[in-house]
Structure formats: C-alpha cells, structure tokens
Amino acid sequence: MGEITIEAAGRAVRFTSPDKVLFPDRGWTKLDVAEHYLRCAPGAVRATLRRPCSLKRWPNGVGADFFFTKRAPSTLREAVAVRFPSARPGRMAIVRDVSDIVDQVQLGVIDLNPWPSRAPDTDHPDELRLDLDPTPGFGFDDCREVAGACRALLAERGLEGWPKTSGSRGIHVYARIHPHWTFHEVRRAALAFAREIERRLPGLATTEWWKEERRGVFIDFNQNARDKTIAAAYSLRHTGLVSAPFGWNEVGTIDPEEMTLEGFRDRWSAVGDLTDGIDDHPGDLGGLLAMADADEAAGLGDAPWPPHYPKQPGEPPRVQPSKRRSDNG
C-alpha cells in the first residue's frame, strides 16, 4: 500500500507507506503508530497543544538510526516562532489538533517531544517537569518512592503533580504553572526542588549531573532548560512502551512493562484520559523559587548545564570530575 488518506479532526491527511514496519521485533507499522494517536487523541493533543515540538524521526524504524528536526519542515501546515538557546530565531512544528500529530507520524515521528511552553508565548513555560531516571542498580520501584516524595513536596508548595511512566525505566511528574517565569527561573526552581528531594531521600535520590558520580534516582533538573524536551504523555516510545499517565493511587502497582501498544489500548478503553483536568489549576512557582533563594544563601550555587548551552553566569566548571582530577594530576 503506497499511500492512503487518514481522516483526522475533520481534515484529510496524506499518509504514505502505511504498512512500513517501524518496530521489527513486534511487527508494528507506521499506520499502527498513527492509529495509536488517533485512539488517545484527547490526551495526546492535551499534552502537545500549541507547544513547539522537536521532531524525533525514525524513517527506517527503531532498529535504525533516528535524527532530530528542530526547524519545522515546509510540508507541515502549523509552525510557531521560537528562540533557541543560542538566541537564534527559528520556527518549530506545533500541534493544533490530532491531524498535526498524524502529520508528524507521516514524517517518521514515533514519540512526541514538546517544549514546556505554548504559543503564542513560547518564552515562558507553563509546565514544571520532573524526570526521574534510575541509575544502574536502581529501578522502577525506586522511582515509585521518589515520585511519592515529589508529590508531597509539590503539594507543600501549592502545586499538583501529575505522574506518568516514562515509556522507559523511569517516571515523569509534571506540574502546571502560570506562564509568568522564564526558562532560567523554572530550571532554577527545578534544581532547588531536586536538591530538597535529595535531602529527604539521601542515598536514593540524586542531583549529581555527572554520570560517574550518580547513584540512585537522578532528578534531571536540566530537562527544564529551553529547547529540552521529554516524551509527552501518551507517546509511544522506541522501547515499544507507551508513556502512560497513572493515578497516584496506582503509584505502587502500575507496571510499565504492560504499557505496550496492545496493553495500552486496553487501558485506554478502561480508564480514558487520566490527564483530564491537568490544565484547570496552574500553580505559583514562588514557593520553589524561595527554596532556591535559601539554597543560594547557604552557598549552594548553580549546577552544570547541558553541553550545547552557552556558559551561564555562576555555573561551575562543565568538566567531569575525573577529568578535572586528571588535569590537575
């Protein structure tokens, strides 16, 4: 089958090579990926609506290389102006309805990778993102405990956490915020949050940026920097697992390995969109920024930024500790 037309949100979308296998071990096709997003459209659109999207493209499936397209291809009907970390302007893909997600799948996208800000104001995030990533020797059960601590601390600071499986080994917890703060301020709040969780769960949670020093569940505060993305809720990942929202009453029982394309189809039929309501009560970031003020007053400065970002004022050396020791030799 060379080309079909998919009806999505009242629009006819041209879709080529629908029977192309993107998951060789499972036999899932390009059309299977599109149908997944059509099935869970209310949640997938809610997660990406008006957000600039990096296009992570797997043109030859998950058994081959992928590449990122940051600037929106001219074939897409929707794009939004943004500023990249270099301060250069650009235009990125954006989702208005599920037909725009199908357009992304047509380009070889499997998982959706939106910014935490929305058009028209893409400079001020409306989402705080907590990415809990277990290091070797730790696993999903450890992420459950850290996620529970994150929920409690968010509530203490007037924010509501919304958890989901990452589609890999970890958990993501999102909190909606008013779009009043810059990316720098949101990242600063995320770093203070992560450090407080590390204090509450010593030996289990970690904020160590350098992998050689990490032990435990890493809270990746840098995911809140401009142009960083995390797979959106309801994304099908290259692992073959869906990044599945769950209720806090499930934090002790949710099994990420059950969230395959087929398993998630049954879950969606049973529970529907568990992110319904996430946009209803955005919170204030002031409580977390007060924690950042206290950390800095106590002598805790910034942490390293990702390597491709411009050097930041007050940032420590962006060199891994073992390399520094070797150089000082």
Describe each PLM feature range.
Residues 165-175:
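Short, conserved phosphate-binding/catalytic loop or strand-edge motifs used
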Residues 2-9, 38-136, 140, 144-148, ...:
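SsDNA-processing nucleotidyl-transfer enzymes
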Residues 141, 164, 177-179:
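Nucleic-acid 5′ end/cap handling module spanning
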Residues 174-188:
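Catalytic palm subdomain of template-directed nucleic-acid polymerases
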Residues 36, 140-159, 186-201:
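Long, well-ordered alpha-helical scaffolding segments within enzyme catalytic domains
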Residues 115-119, 159-165:
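Catalytic micro-motifs at enzyme active sites that drive phosphoryl/nucleotidyl and oxygen chemistry
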